[in-house]
Amino acid sequence: MEYGLDLEYSFNEFLKGFGLSSEIAHIIWLPLPMLLVLVAAVVGVLVTVWLERKISAAAQQRIGPEYAGALGVLQPIADGLKLLVKEDIIPAKADGILFTAGPILVLVPVILSWLIVPFGQNLLISNVGIGIFLWIALSSIQPIGLLMSGYASNNKYSLLGGLRAAAQSISYEIPLALSVLAIVLMTNSLSTIDIVNQQSGAGILSWNIWRQPVGFIVFWICALAECERLPFDLPEAEEELVAGYQTEYAGMKFALFYLGSYINLILSALLVSILYLGGWGFPIPVELIAKFLNLPINAPLIQVFTASIGIVMTVLKAYLLVFIAILLRWTTPRVRIDQLLDLGWKFLLPISLANLLITAGLKLAFPQFFGG
């Protein structure tokens, strides 16, 4: 039986109470999920930027943002407003069309990837059944935008940054996909909902991180490289390339890169939470909660409670990983480009391939533990 709150059904029933037909209620509902995704992504970025600035300040024995709101919580909003009102400059010798299209091509696939992120049994924008395949396909578009931005800027530093970004993304996309395929192999499904449901039954012991520790490590390393986080921020290494492919950008175009980078980091953390850490699952079974409250399992209060707990659990697990990513920024040195490519092609790719083959063997030998 499926537990949790079905937002679409509840919203349609609410509108029907005002005399609207099912078709009109469905049409009104259609744009709302994407609006919710945009709001959630932007709020997530604001929280992450504030956390990074405060944690970075603590690592350097500084105070960090302090004056814009309590504890500086409004500083990310102030930064966004500053970029919003800055002049949008296009270099005289740049390719204007590609220069403008580059940031859009970087941001849009990342936002669309949020469509497959579930926060509960029914709290999913689009359960297409091939969510993992859709995410891998969308993530392969981003390097085109990065390379396009570097080329269109007509700047040697931008071009080098774009080439580095494309090489880095391609190098780490393959082991990333292979580590996810091991999860798909155990689940027999490309649906993120099925992957989370497969991790239920024994609480924390059901999580895929215990059956896929190598895949978890490979996925997280590759995700950090895809997000261009230290120690993998070579495309925009300030000491070498000024700001890489972002060098000639200003105003909102620069903000789109900034936004895309942080949305991608949060998305990667959410996917790790879903694929390896049980997603919205929490230790106490829903049946026990309903029995304790003396309510039926499908009571509205139980549905709201399980939906709320599911969202909180998913986000908490994701932000634990974001916290680790921020700490890595101040505890690891930047690698060289040859070291980065060697790590991707000579180590992570063979390890992810071996992990996939071992998973297939374990599935045949122990189907009760590794999927049937």
UniProtKB/Swiss-Prot annotation:
Biological role stated in the UniProt entry: NDH-1 shuttles electrons from an unknown electron donor, via FMN and iron-sulfur (Fe-S) centers, to quinones in the respiratory and/or the photosynthetic chain. The immediate electron acceptor for the enzyme in this species is believed to be plastoquinone. Couples the redox reaction to proton translocation, and thus conserves the redox energy in a proton gradient.
UniProt entry keywords in alphabetical sequence: Membrane, NAD, NADP, Plastoquinone, Quinone, Thylakoid, Translocase, Transmembrane, Transmembrane helix
What this protein is called in its record is: NAD(P)H-quinone oxidoreductase subunit 1
Query: Which reactions fall under this protein's catalytic activity?
Result: a plastoquinone + NADH + (n+1) H(+)(in) = a plastoquinol + NAD(+) + n H(+)(out); a plastoquinone + NADPH + (n+1) H(+)(in) = a plastoquinol + NADP(+) + n H(+)(out)
Which GO molecular function annotations are given, in alphabetical order? Answer: NADH dehydrogenase activity; oxidoreductase activity, acting on NAD(P)H, quinone or similar compound as acceptor; quinone binding
- Alphabetical list of NCBIfam families matching this protein: PRK06076.1-2, PRK06076.1-5
Q: What is its main location?
A: membrane
What InterPro entries does its record include? Answer: NADH_UbQ_OxRdtase_su1/FPO (IPR001694), NADH_UbQ_OxRdtase_su1_CS (IPR018086)
Top class in the EC scheme: translocase
Q: One Pfam family for this entry, by name?
A: NADHdh
* Organism listed in the record: Prochlorococcus marinus (strain MIT 9301)
Instruction: Supply the gene name.
Output: ndhA
Stored PANTHER family: NADH DEHYDROGENASE SUBUNIT 1, NADH-UBIQUINONE OXIDOREDUCTASE CHAIN 1
Membrane topology qualifier: Multi-pass membrane protein
EC assignment: the record states: 7.1.1.-
Subunit structure as annotated in this protein's UniProt entry = NDH-1 is composed of at least 11 different subunits.
Q: Where are the transmembrane segments?
A: 27-47, 97-117, 128-148, 176-196, 204-224, 266-286, 308-328, 347-367
Q: Where in the cell is it found?
A: Cellular thylakoid membrane
Q: What family, per the record?
A: Belongs to the complex I subunit 1 family.
Q: In its keyword annotation, does this UniProt entry include Thylakoid?
A: yes
Quote the cellular component terms of the Gene Ontology held in the record. plasma membrane-derived thylakoid membrane
| GO biological process: one example | aerobic respiration
